[in-house]
A protein has these predicted regions:
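Short, low-complexity disordered leader/linker segments with a strong preference
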Residues: 1-38, 60, 414-421
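Extracytoplasmic/periplasmic solute-binding protein
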Residues: 140-144, 149, 173-220, 226, ...
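A structural signal for short loop-to-beta-strand junctions that line the ligand-binding cleft
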Residues: 91-92, 121-157, 187-188, 299-302, ...
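Short, solvent-exposed loop/beta-turn-alpha elements that line the ligand-binding surface or hinge
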Residues: 114-125, 167, 189, 208-229, ...
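C-terminal lobe and pocket-closing loops
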Residues: 270-284, 295-391, 419-421
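Glycine-centered hinge/linker elements that transmit conformational signals in sensory
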Residues: 178-179, 217-247
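Extracytoplasmic "Venus flytrap"/periplasmic binding protein-like
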Residues: 57-125, 160-162, 257, 261-265
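Hinge/lid segment of periplasmic solute-binding proteins
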Residues: 98-148, 175, 202, 288-290, ...
């Protein structure tokens, strides 16, 4: 995914901004010397330009702290972080996927940051980042940035059909408009049968969940009335196009399908629009974005919030410097800059206006205010590895009895989530 880079700002101005919002003395210096805070950030989470600007500004504002950032690859990062937390040479700050925090916290390898929430404006954090950053009642992950799915649509096809996306305030209005678009060789929507993150949003809209916990034991919840209603809506929407019922958005890549020119809309992160244009330059300027509509007017659809949290290993050599680093990077000034630079959703709802001029990011921000995460337990990783949710969706879309298939999938989820208990 390609992102727009942040325009350069002088180090002097940056340092002044940092000084104005800095956390003050952190006690991290080593006997009057300079402390080096070791940081692991993930590939492409920030641009090289942003990383340089932040590092220079931070070090100018905090002359007793040097920043050493190591870029990590997503492939295999779970095992690498687990190994680092178990050793004696862990970095001071680690960027972790928001849904990964629970498994690292369960191991006892993370520092409990609960007493720093107020200092870090925790009351305003996006729920989809803050909730998975907590485990067993304690806050381990500090929300860093978010991204979620929106509707990417063809402006010209919507206009030709007389559909105004601004008027699609409910799911039923969305269905009616998509039905109108689904004619004359145009797919109203390309929705593959196994886009389970989208299904999760519809389930949450109905008041349901993928799984629930009681007395320390997790239970699959796809067979509840609420979850079944979410699946029923997914089936209605999926039928208004030619998306395959037995695969997800990667097989075939849905951006490439949309680039062929016969698809009116897809559910994707805004970055998917860049891939569409790369595959068909004639569509440049013809793509727009709107939040996934909700069940009722005035409330956008629930979405799965992807993104990252920042954590501090329990074995970190410089925890005070680590917290100073985190406070700056997750504070107002740098969150606004990061959001503009990378088309992200900032970590707090009050900062959403920072991306008002970015159509894709602003559509994400509307949805992110109603964001959720997958069940906050290490056991969910086993569910995703098998992914009975995908099999359930295909079974229903190909004629299976929804209640029976949901019961089977829920049993599989229950088994997977409790396998290690």
């Amino acid at each position: 995914m390609k992102y727009r880079l942040l325009a350069g700002v002088s180090a002097l101005v940056t340092a002044a901004a940092l000084s104005a919002c800095s956390s003050g003395g952190d006690g991290a210096g080593e006997a009057g010397g300079v402390t080096t805070v070791d940081v692991w950030l993930m590939r492409d989470s920030v641009s090289a330009a942003f990383q340089k600007e932040f590092t220079e500004g931070f070090e100018a504002a905090h002359p007793d702290i040097d920043v050493k950032i190591q870029i990590q690859e997503w492939d295999g990062i779970g095992q690498k972080i687990t190994a680092a937390l178990a050793g004696n040479d862990a970095p001071d700050v680690i960027e972790a996927g928001n849904t990964q925090v629970a498994q690292f916290a369960e191991s006892g390898g993370l520092l409990d940051l609960s007493d720093r929430k107020d200092e870090l404006d925790g009351g305003d954090w996006l729920k989809g980042l803050a909730e998975p950053g907590a485990y067993d009642g304690k806050q381990y992950g500090i929300p860093y940035y978010a991204a979620n799915r929106v509707v990417v649509y063809r402006k010209d096809l919507f206009e030709k059909a007389g559909v105004d996306p601004a008027e699609l305030t409910t799911r039923e209005e969305w269905i009616a408009a998509t039905t109108k678009l689904n004619r004359g060789g145009t797919q109203g929507i390309y929705l593959p049968g196994q886009l389970w993150y989208a299904l999760a949003g519809f389930v949450w809209d109905e008041g349901g969940d993928l799984a629930t916990e009681s007395g320390g034991r997790w239970k699959g919840a796809l067979d509840t009335p609420e979850a079944l209603r979410g699946m029923a809506f997914y089936a209605r929407l999926q039928a208004l196009g030619k998306g395959p019922r037995d695969s997800d958005e990667d097989d075939p890549p849905q951006a490439e399908v949309m680039a062929q020119g016969q698809v009116a809309q897809v559910i994707s992160t805004p970055g998917g629009a860049n891939v569409v244009v790369e595959n068909n330059p004639e569509l440049k300027g013809k793509l727009g974005f709107f939040p996934i509509p909700g069940k009722t007017a005035g409330t956008p659809g629930a979405v799965f919030t992807g993104g990252s949290d920042l954590v501090v290993p329990a074995a970190a050599g410089h925890p005070d410097a680590a917290l100073t680093f985190i406070k700056e990077l997750t504070g107002d000034a740098w969150q606004k800059k990061l959001a503009v630079a990378m088309s992200y959703v900032p970590n707090r709802t009050s900062l959403a206006p920072a991306v008002a001029e970015d159509p894709g990011a602003s559509a994400m921000a509307v949805g992110a205010a109603h964001g959720h995460a997958t069940p906050n337990t290490p056991g969910w990783a086993a569910v995703e590895a098998e992914n009975p949710v995908k099999d359930y969706m295909t079974a229903v879309l190909t004629g299976g009895d929804a209640e029976q298939e949901a019961a089977k999938a829920s049993a599989d989820i229950t088994r997977a989530m409790n396998a290690g208990s």
